[in-house]
């Protein structure tokens, strides 16, 4: 199994942990866009998506829609509502990628290295900033809680 396949399997495991069904079909054409439906807690993941390097991010994005609870509607008349749902899907997708990196001891010295490694498009770079800032905040908070519980001193 290569690194991309490992990440995809890990994402499928995350979906399963959150009672999200991931359906695939080997016959889907490479341009069939992956989708998700919150009510069914289901993701339709296209294993033939081209370019192949985008497959993990598209799966993480669709899982992100369900985890965020935002319903995406292609018939939505209010573009800002749809953009918010897409942004939430993007943010959670990046947070999932960061969690994968953390659990697999993968580190990057810069955000740009993360962006390049996962082929994150320019349209999602603001969410990379949001996700990394949130992750750093959560790590600092956890460290403070551990320090307080072990020493009784606030850092």
Where are these regions (language model features)?
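Active-site hotspot residues in diverse enzymes, especially metal/ion-binding acidic/histidine motifs
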Residues: 1-155
């Amino acid at each position: 199994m290569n690194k991309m396949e490992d990440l995809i399997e890990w994402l499928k495991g995350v979906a399963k942990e959150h009672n999200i069904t991931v359906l695939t079909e080997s016959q889907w054409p490479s341009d069939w866009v992956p989708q998700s439906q919150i009510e069914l807690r289901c993701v339709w993941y296209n294993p033939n998506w081209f370019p192949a390097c985008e497959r993990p991010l598209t799966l993480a994005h669709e899982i992100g829609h369900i985890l965020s609870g935002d319903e995406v509607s292609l018939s939505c008349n209010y573009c800002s509502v749809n953009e918010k749902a897409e942004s939430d899907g993007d943010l959670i997708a990046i947070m999932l990628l960061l969690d994968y990196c953390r659990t697999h001891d993968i580190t990057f010295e810069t955000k740009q290295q993360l962006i390049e490694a996962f082929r994150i498009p320019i349209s999602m770079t603001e969410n990379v900033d949001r996700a990394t800032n949130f992750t750093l905040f959560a790590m600092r908070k956890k460290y403070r809680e551990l320090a307080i519980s072990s020493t009784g001193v606030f850092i």
